[in-house]
């Protein structure tokens, strides 16, 4: 099972859209976007831009969770996580006009 992983951070959203498109050009079975904390909204935006502008038939699964991270002075913090799995259907095509 082939998959590509795109880690979402603080870059502009179109950088991640480009990474997703590049990943799909290698014909993986799925592309996974992973993000934590404040980057979660960027991951959702990148997935939606890719789905609405570039692929007409892209399906997604979303998994959310929490990770414990050690912070300053040994304290633990809870950080939200998201994993968005994008799959391209075999009949998926680029929308006309793009």
Predicted regions and their residues:
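C-terminal edge-of-domain segments
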Residues: 60-98
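Short, surface-exposed connector motifs at secondary-structure boundaries
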Residues: 26-32
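Alpha-helix C-cap/termination motif
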Residues: 23-26, 53
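Histone-fold modules and their flanking histone-like tails across chromatin and transcription assemblies
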Residues: 1-24
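A generic structural signal for short, non-catalytic loop/turn and secondary-structure boundary residues
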Residues: 1, 55-57, 77
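Short glycine-centered, acidic/aromatic-flanked micro-motifs in structured strand/loop junctions
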Residues: 35-37
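Short, hydrophobic/π-rich interface segment
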Residues: 39-60, 71
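A broad, low-specificity signal marking well-ordered, structured residues that form hydrophobic/aromatic
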Residues: 6, 31, 82
């Amino acid at each position: 099972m082939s998959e590509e992983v795109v880690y979402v951070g603080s870059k502009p959203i179109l950088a991640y859209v480009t990474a997703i498109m590049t990943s799909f050009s290698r014909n993986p079975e799925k592309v996974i976007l992973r993000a934590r904390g404040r980057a979660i909204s960027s991951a959702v935006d990148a997935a939606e831009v890719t789905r609405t502008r570039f692929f007409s038939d892209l399906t997604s699964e979303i998994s959310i969770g929490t990770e414990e991270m050690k912070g300053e002075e040994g304290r633990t913090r809870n950080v939200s996580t998201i994993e968005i799995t994008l799959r391209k259907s075999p009949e998926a095509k680029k929308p006309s006009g793009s």
